């Protein structure tokens, strides 16, 4: 195992995500980053497939680590300078079921109808592979979100905005879905997709300077 006490520091991290929210959150921390997006020949969606009977926390951690390993391989193949790689993955769970990204408007509306008037969990996993290629112990942020009761018409109007698409659980807490959020217990940044407390700890352990 590398001696981290003697490791050099790195002025930036590779962010393997296309999420503008995660970029904004890294900006909030003052972390410099370079994007490391999947190449056109990579099947990123295949990594998100659920295994039969898989628990939500196991699922999100497994997917996050798989994405981190794919990103590290992409970095090595690119010949770019060595630096740590950061990956995050978020899922929503209700009654033990995983609510991923909606397939279409009907799917989004069905998800939101399930969440209305209920408390669900938002799980965000973080994985960092350091500059030597070692996977650091992943982190998991768990937050509870309470949705107020909402009419089907109100939910349908929200779906029509297009905001639910590409979002786990079919909503973005930092967007117009805030009108449905009665309360949260946990990490607001984690619900957005990058828990900053855990991210800062992992990045400092990987010797990212910020």
Swiss-Prot record:
GO molecular function: dTTP diphosphatase activity; UTP diphosphatase activity
SUPFAM superfamilies: ITPase-like
Compartment(s): Cytoplasm
Any GO CC annotation of this UniProt entry: cytoplasm
Cofactor(s) recorded in Swiss-Prot or TrEMBL: a divalent metal cation
Site (Important for substrate specificity): 21, 90, 174
Reaction catalysed by this enzyme: dTTP + H2O = dTMP + diphosphate + H(+); UTP + H2O = UMP + diphosphate + H(+)
A Pfam family hit: Maf
Spans through the membrane: none
Keyword Cytoplasm attributed: yes
GO biological process, one term: nucleotide metabolic process
Residues spanning the signal sequence: none
InterPro entries found in the cross-reference section: ITPase-like_fam, Maf-like
PANTHER family for the chain: BIFUNCTIONAL DTTP/UTP PYROPHOSPHATASE/METHYLTRANSFERASE PROTEIN-RELATED, BIFUNCTIONAL DTTP_UTP PYROPHOSPHATASE_METHYLTRANSFERASE PROTEIN-RELATED
Family assignment from sequence similarity: Belongs to the Maf family. YhdE subfamily.
Role this protein plays: Nucleoside triphosphate pyrophosphatase that hydrolyzes dTTP and UTP. May have a dual role in cell division arrest and in preventing the incorporation of modified nucleotides into cellular nucleic acids.
Protein name: dTTP/UTP pyrophosphatase
Native species: Burkholderia thailandensis (strain ATCC 700388 / DSM 13276 / CCUG 48851 / CIP 106301 / E264)
Lineage: Bacteria, Pseudomonadati, Pseudomonadota, Betaproteobacteria, Burkholderiales
């Amino acid at each position: 195992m590398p001696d981290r006490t003697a490791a050099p520091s790195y002025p930036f991290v590779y962010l393997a995500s296309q999420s503008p929210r995660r970029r904004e959150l890294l900006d909030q921390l003052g972390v410099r980053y370079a994007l490391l997006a999947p190449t056109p020949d990579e099947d990123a969606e295949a990594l998100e497939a659920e295994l039969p009977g898989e628990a939500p926390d196991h699922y999100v951690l497994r997917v996050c680590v798989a994405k981190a390993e794919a990103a590290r391989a992409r970095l090595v193949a690119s010949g770019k300078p060595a630096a740590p790689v950061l990956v995050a993955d978020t899922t929503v769970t209700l009654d033990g079921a995983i609510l991923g990204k909606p397939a279409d408007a009907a799917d989004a509306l069905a998800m939101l109808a399930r969440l209305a008037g209920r408390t669900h969990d938002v799980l965000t996993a973080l994985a960092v592979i350091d500059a030597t290629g070692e996977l650091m112990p992943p982190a998991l942020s768990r937050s509870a979100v309470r949705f107020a009761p909402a009419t089907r018409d109100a939910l349908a109007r929200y779906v029509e905005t297009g905001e639910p698409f590409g979002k786990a659980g079919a909503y973005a807490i930092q967007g117009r879905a805030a009108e449905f959020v009665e309360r949260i217990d946990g990490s607001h940044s984690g619900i957005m997709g990058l828990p900053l407390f855990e991210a800062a700890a992992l990045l400092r352990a990987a010797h990212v300077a910020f």
